[in-house]
Every structure is written in structure tokens, then in C-alpha cells.
């Protein structure tokens, strides 16, 4: 029997906002709450999820493209029980339009496999508005835009939000504020961003949650151990975020842009 799966795409307008850290910690938190979770790292050649988890998947989606591995072999179970799917290791893989199309077809195959066996599939995208980002958002039931308070990051996030809503005005987009000192600061950043999007595209993302700015999070990146395993304040933040995501599960969306 097919599971009722929810696909959440985690995106950002620019790099350096902690998107992959959010994806990894949220995946482990949902798993700890009893959900089966797959984490698809769609950042071709520059994916950080395996590094942050200190895992070394033997196969990637690129191996599936080359017929060197079956879909089940590409699914790697981490020590925390998350199914990790890595797109490709080589940064110069799938750079042409034709190669990207082939990759997206294989990503679709892996996504269907993950959706069939898991309650949640989290897709960690590259930063920006490229083709793989659009592919991942188009396949999602819900999008989560990672925000930080820097003006350039807000501007880049706005460009991505504008692209999303001009493509699909009904797309369910939420925001996660990262690197915030307090809940009040996080709410202020989310509200400021919502004011911008409401003014120019007449839409506003739902504020899903926030992650505190802590030295322990930076340390967890260096030690390749997700902070939710040992830092209570981070555990609390991600547990609240996971609760919002789990309670707000959306019905299946139909893709409207097939590359």
C-alpha cells in the first residue's frame, strides 16, 4: 500500500544561510518523532548533507543515471535512521541543459521511490533560482524558504519567492528564520520579509519557525554531528519546527512545470 507522503523542499535565495544545516537537523528531528524520513540532497556536486551527517553513501543518483546502481542502492540509511539520497559528487556533473534533463528524470525516479516508502521527503536544494531548484519546488507539497536578517539575503530570498509565486500563485511557501538571537528578532525578520512580498507580489509566506544563533551549531558543523543530538536549545527549536511541519501536512500537489 502506498504511503501518504509529504514532500518538503528547503530552499534559499543565496548560499551561506544554513539551509543544509536546517535540512539535516529537521530530518533527524522528524525521525526522532516517529516519522520515516528521506533526505534528498539535490545540490549537484556541492551537497553538504552527507558531510554534515558524517556519512559516505556508496552510490549517488549519478550512478543511477549511468546504470551503475539501482534506486534501492542509492538510498543510504544513516546512523540516525534517515534515508539519505545524494545527487552527485562531481561539481561539474550535469552542467548542460541535456544533462540536467537526464538528471531530473533520475531524480524523479528516486523521489517516487522515497515517497513510496517514507512519511516525509525533504529536498535540500542548491541556493538560488536554477533549474534544479525549480525542479525541487515543482515536486514539493510545501516549500520552506530559509531566511537570515542580512539585506542581501532578504533581497535574494525575495527574488526566489517572486519566481515561485509568479509560476504558481497558489504555491504553499513557508519561511524558516535562521541565525536569530531571539524569537522576537526571528518574528521581526519574518514579518519584514512578508511585508516585502505582500507589497510586490501580493503573497506572504507562512512563518514556520526559527533556529537560534549559537556557537554550538557552528561546532556541530565542524564535528559533523547534527546539533539536535546534543544541544537542548536547538532540539527545542527544531522540535517546534517539526511539529508545525507535521501538523500542517499538505495534500499532494501536482507538478505544473515538468522540465
Feature roles, as predicted:
Residues 1-5:
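Phosphate-binding P-loop
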Residues 6-71, 120-122:
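Walker A/P-loop NTP-binding active-site region of P-loop NTPases
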Residues 39-116, 215-223:
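P-loop/Walker-type NTP enzyme "switch/lid" segment
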Residues 55-59, 163-164, 190-194, 226-228:
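Short, hinge-like loop/turn segments at secondary-structure boundaries
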Residues 120-209:
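Conserved catalytic-core segment of NTP-binding enzymes
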Residues 199-227:
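Beta-strand-loop-alpha "switch" segments that mediate conformational coupling across diverse proteins
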Residues 222-259:
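NTP-binding/hydrolysis catalytic cores, primarily Walker-type P-loop NTPases
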Amino acid at each position: 500500500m502506498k504511503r501518504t507522503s509529504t514532500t518538503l523542499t528547503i530552499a534559499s535565495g543565496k548560499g551561506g544561510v544554513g539551509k543544509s544545516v536546517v535540512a539535516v537537523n529537521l530530518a533527524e528531528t522528524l525521525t526522532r518523532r516517529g516519522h520515516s524520513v528521506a533526505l534528498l540532497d539535490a545540490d549537484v556536486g556541492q551537497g553538504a548533507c552527507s558531510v554534515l551527517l558524517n556519512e559516505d553513501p556508496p552510490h549517488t543518483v549519478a550512478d543511477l543515471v549511468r546504470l551503475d546502481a539501482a534506486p534501492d542502492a542509492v538510498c543510504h540509511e544513516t546512523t540516525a535512521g534517515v534515508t539519505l539520497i545524494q545527487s552527485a559528487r562531481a561539481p561539474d556533473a550535469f552542467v548542460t541543459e541535456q544533462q540536467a534533463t537526464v538528471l531530473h528524470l533520475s531524480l524523479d525516479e528516486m523521489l517516487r521511490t522515497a515517497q513510496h516508502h517514507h512519511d516525509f521527503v525533504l529536498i535540500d536544494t542548491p541556493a538560488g533560482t536554477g533549474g534544479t531548484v525549480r525542479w525541487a519546488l515543482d515536486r514539493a507539497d510545501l516549500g520552506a524558504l530559509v531566511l537570515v536578517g542580512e539585506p542581501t539575503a532578504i533581497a535574494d530570498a525575495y527574488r526566489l519567492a517572486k519566481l515561485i509565486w509568479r509560476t504558481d500563485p497558489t504555491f504553499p511557501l513557508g519561511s524558516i528564520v535562521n541565525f536569530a538571537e531571539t524569537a522576537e528578532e526571528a518574528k521581526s525578520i519574518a514579518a519584514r520579509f512578508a511585508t516585502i512580498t505582500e507589497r510586490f507580489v501580493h503573497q506572504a509566506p507562512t512563518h514556520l519557525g526559527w533556529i537560534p544563533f549559537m556557537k554550538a551549531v557552528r561546532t556541530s558543523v565542524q564535528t559533523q554531528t547534527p546539533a539536535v543530538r546534543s544541544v537542548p536549545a536547538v532540539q527545542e527549536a527544531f522540535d517546534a519546527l517539526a511539529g508545525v511541519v507535521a501538523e500542517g501536512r499538505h495534500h499532494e500537489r501536482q507538478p505544473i512545470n515538468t522540465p
